[in-house]
Every structure is written in structure tokens, then in C-alpha cells.
Amino acid sequence: MNAVVIAVAVMLLLALLRVHVVIALFIGALAGGLIAGMGIEATMLAFQSGLGDGAKIALSYALLGAFAMAVAASGLPKILADTLIRRLDADAEHASAKVVKVTSYLLIAGILAMSIMSQNIIPVHIAFIPLLIPPLLTVMNRLQLDRRLIACVLTFGLVTTYMTLPVGFGKIFLEDILLSNIERAGLDTEGINIVQVMGIPAMGMVLGLLVAIFVSYRKPRQYEDRPIMGGTVAEPTPTRYNLIMSLVAIVATFAIQLIVQFSGSEADGLLLGSLVGLGIFLISGVVEWNKADDVFTSGMRMMALIGFVMISAQGFAAVINESNHVEPLVAAVQQFFGYNQAMAALAMLIVGLIVTMGIGSSFSTLPIIAAIYVPLCVSLDFSAMATIALIGTAGALGDAGSPASDSTLGSTAGLAADGQHDHMRDTVIPTFIHYNIPLTGAGWIAAMVL
């Protein structure tokens, strides 16, 4: 009985039974270690040693959560939302078919741009969704925009950006987690252009988005005008000064990331940029000193769960590596597939989809599958670029369609603010169909051609 298979199966089963993911990862690692004959002490030591590998990533998430709340406190999201509402309201008054169509596409483009920027230029991740989307629901109702389409647009911007561009959250996914864990598993990635490698799988996401916009959800859908559930949240009053200082903080945060990244420094530009951005918000008075603790704590709390899951996943991966059961599993899989790379690649992508669906986070999936897939890809003679594409795609698969992923939960949090959007039917299923199917195909093609 292979300890790696048992560990992953136990973890997935518990996660699907809605046991907390952190607990599921810990119990799965414990089961794998015991099956491997490591004993309680050796298993715990391996798990504990792996926890440190996720600490920097978790800290990055916490600081970005604080930065997101600081941006929200400045009133910048409210300005963006109010500007969109005014312009769209003005257009909606002249409701000719052509104006409605143009306005709808402008709204879609605006939401897509914001979701892309939330991963790098304004690194707030999903925090912008409950701030920006609920005020726009009334306008969407007038335009009869299908909210399933908006869920697909939001998910595309969140997932495709971090899996392709190594800036902001993309740096965490591509460099701090993907390349770092692949190198830790023994594969040399020196000189590989990660954007070129992940660009092919990203084309699958683009295809899914185009199908969602122009085929699946192009027809009007009726919604009622209902009040936002829970009433309106007290929002800051935006001022010109706050707007200017917010833009300064955002530009500084983004610029520092780029400078550190392209200077060849090994320092973490995301951590440094976030700290500088937070400092600007504090020193400028946009975030008042007596409220800073509450603002930053609420932001860190928002990202804390994701951080803990990432730390636990690194511990799980460490137990997998120490079990000495990866090599027998690789040998068994190689014997089953022979040297049929096409079938092996498809199987690895499907397994990655299942694991991500169970955990709910592609960021947390990568350390686990990298420990298993790197030796497997080497044994099947996949190139280093093909291996990276396979593991990166296998990790991203499922994030778009997992009921527990932050991408789908964030989309639903905004779109269901008036009670007319179902999480499973209107977010999970549409994003799963439109992204996981073409992403699987594009990832398979990347593995075959790279």
C-alpha cells in the first residue's frame, strides 16, 4: 500500500466531507507517515520542518490583506464604483439595443481590468469584489447581464493573471511556490522563461472566456431590483487628497516589486512593496493612526485562512518527500503508462484537478503535486519546460471550479449580495465548465510541444 496515495486520498476525502482543509492536510500527512513506517515522531518532525517553507508566502498574503483594507479605507474602490455607476446609469437611460450592448461590454471590460489589476498593480486579490460588485448589481439588472458571465469574467482575471504574470500574486504562485517547489524536488529550472511556459495553458482560459461572453451567456437574463442583504456598509468619504495618496501608494508598491524583481535581488519585492505602501498610507494620514490597528488586522484576518492552508500544504509535502514512497509510486505509474507521455500527461492533469478541488486552493496544491510529479515527469522524459507547464496547469486546474476556492467564493460574495446568485449553480458550475475543460486541453498541448 503506497503511503503517498493513502495520504492524498485521506486528505481529499476529509476535505470533500467539509472537514477544515488545514485539519485534513494534517491528518492526511499523519496517515501517510504512519503507513510509510515513519512513526509519529518522524512524521511530526517532517511536517514541522516543512511548515517553515510556507511562512514567507503566508506573511506576503497577510501584508497584502492589510494593504487591501488600507486601499478600501482610502475610499478609492468607492470612487471607482461610483464613477462606473454614474456613467452606466447615464447610458442606461437611453436604453436602445446598441447602447445596452456597448454599455454591457464596457462594464465587462471594466470588471475584467479590475480583476487583472487586483493580482499585481493593486494587489488586493479578491478583496475588491465585495467593495466593487454590489453597487453595480442594479446597473447589471438594467442591462440584463447574466451574472454567470460576470462570475466567469472575475474568475478569469483572478486565475489567468497569477498563473501567467510573475508580478504580485503571480510572483507568489510562479516563483515562490511553483519554481521553488520544483527545484526543491530536484529539477533545475535555471534560465526558463516562466511566462512563455505558462502562456500556452493560459490560452485555454482565454478560449473559455470568449465562449462565456459570446456564446454561453450572451442572452439577456432578468433579475429583480432588490436591496443589498445586510444593508449598506459604512464607507469612507473619498477626498482628492486620499485619492492622490492612494495612487502614490499603489504606484510605489508596484514599482518596488518591479525594481526588486528585475534587479536580480533575492529580496522579496512583494513584501517590501507592501510594507512601503502601508507606510505611505500611515504617514500620509489616509489611514489614521488610531484606526490603523483595526484596518490592518481586518485585512490580515481576511487572508489568514489562505496563509494557514499554504503553510499546512508545505508540511504535507515535506512528509510526502520523507516517506520514501514517491519513487515506488513513480515506478508503478511508469510501468502502467510505459513511455506514453500523452496518457501520462492527461492523467496527471486530472489528478491535479481532483486535488485542487479537494483543497480549494491552487497555491496550496502545488507543493503537494510537485513532490510527486517532478520525479514522475523525469522518469517519463518530459522536458523541464513541459514539467513546469504540467505542474503549473495541474495546480491551477480546479481553482476556477472548486466550491471552496477563494476565486469562486469571492465572486459569489459580490454577485449574491442581493440574494439572486447561487454559489454552486451560478459560479462553480459555469466556471468549472468554461475553464477547467479548455485548461486541461491547453495544458496537455503544452506538455506535448514544450
What are these regions (language model features)?
Residues 1-63, 199-318, 434-438, 442-450:
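Hydrophobic transmembrane alpha-helices of multi-pass small-molecule transporters
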Residues 1-4, 55, 126-128, 203, ...:
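Structural signature of hydrophobic alpha-helical transmembrane segments
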Residues 95-118, 143-160, 186-197, 341-355, ...:
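Alpha-helical transmembrane segments of multi-pass membrane proteins
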